[in-house]
UniProtKB/Swiss-Prot annotation:
SUPFAM superfamilies: Ribosomal protein S10. The keyword Transmembrane does not apply. The lineage of its organism: Archaea, Methanobacteriati, Methanobacteriota, Stenosarchaea group, Methanomicrobia. Gene3D superfamilies: Ribosomal protein S10 domain. This is Small ribosomal subunit protein uS10. One of its GO terms (cellular component) is small ribosomal subunit. It comes from Methanospirillum hungatei JF-1 (strain ATCC 27890 / DSM 864 / NBRC 100397 / JF-1). SMART domains: Ribosomal_S10. Pfam families: Ribosomal_S10. GO terms for biological process: translation. Part of the 30S ribosomal subunit. InterPro entries: Ribosomal_uS10 (IPR001848), Ribosomal_uS10_CS (IPR018268), Ribosomal_uS10_dom (IPR027486), Ribosomal_uS10_dom_sf (IPR036838), Ribosomal_uS10_euk/arc (IPR005729). One of its GO terms (molecular function) is tRNA binding. Involved in the binding of tRNA to the ribosomes. Belongs to the universal ribosomal protein uS10 family.
């Protein structure tokens, strides 16, 4: 049987967890095996910026950062489960990637 590997990415971890819960509910309703959600390492993107625009004075810095949270879910690729998975509403700032493996 094929397996579907689902990778979720987003900057808001609460929205990522909400989508994980929706996928868990689909797996329970359809009765397919589910492994996960497996939390992958959070990537921190840090950008240091000088506060002073002209370069004079003391060197004070602002540090802006964005955290990218990732989750990995494996489930059996049942046709009914995948159809329901494709119909779920996912927030537009959450990236979802589905790969079918044999």
């Amino acid at each position: 049987m094929q397996k579907a590997r689902i990778r979720l990415t987003g900057t808001d971890y609460q929205k990522v967890e909400e989508v994980c819960e929706k996928i868990k509910e689909i797996a329970e309703r359809t009765g397919v095996n589910l492994a996960g959600p497996i939390p992958l390492p959070t990537r921190k993107l840090v950008v240091p910026i000088r506060k002073s625009p002209d370069g004079e004075g003391t060197a004070t810095w602002d540090r802006w950062q964005m955290r990218v949270h990732k989750r990995l879910i494996d489930l059996d690729a049942d046709e009914r489960a995948l159809r329901q998975l494709m119909r779920t509403q996912v927030p537009k700032d959450i990236g979802i990637e589905i790969v079918l493996e044999s």
